[in-house]
């Protein structure tokens, strides 16, 4: 016996009944769907339809709003930045800007307003960083390592 000769035992897979092929077939005329009505039609399920009962999305009150002026900031942990510096993807001797972080692949997404530096991980070198924002713990960690952080968003808010 060869691989191309393998097949199921006779009767292992019952043939599916074809629908709508006469009364004698057992699945003729209405094809087991009963008589008329919504469920007899093609494409039965209607999302959110609860049989005439007021659907849950209309029973619950509306809440909140979407602020169209909200700005999203891409998070970046100092541990990730440190790994990139050690791997040679970011030059620690130069000032590290958001463009340098984007070029190194540390920041993704086109619609982010800037980068926010967060404190997870450790940083071992003195670096000079310019980002949109930084948490207090991240700022303390960078300054403890001998570096400095300049935030652009805070500077813009102070000027306004």
Curated annotation (Swiss-Prot):
SUPFAM superfamilies: Ribosomal proteins L15p and L18e
Biased composition (Gly residues): 21-35
An individual GO BP term: translation
Sequence ranges of Basic and acidic residues compositional bias: 1-11
UniProtKB keywords: Ribonucleoprotein, Ribosomal protein, RNA-binding, rRNA-binding
GO CC annotations, alphabetized: cytosolic large ribosomal subunit
Region (Disordered): 1-39
Gene3D superfamilies attached to this UniProt entry: 3.100.10.10
UniProt-listed PROSITE patterns: RIBOSOMAL_L15
InterPro entries: Ribosomal_uL15, Ribosomal_uL15/eL18, Ribosomal_uL15/eL18_sf, Ribosomal_uL15_bac-type, Ribosomal_uL15_CS
Cross-referenced HAMAP family: Ribosomal_uL15 (MF_01341)
Function text: Binds to the 23S rRNA.
Quaternary structure annotation from Swiss-Prot or TrEMBL: Part of the 50S ribosomal subunit.
PANTHER family for the chain: 50S RIBOSOMAL PROTEIN L15 (PTHR12934), LARGE RIBOSOMAL SUBUNIT PROTEIN UL15M (PTHR12934:SF11)
Name of this protein: Large ribosomal subunit protein uL15
Protein's organism: Granulibacter bethesdensis (strain ATCC BAA-1260 / CGDNIH1)
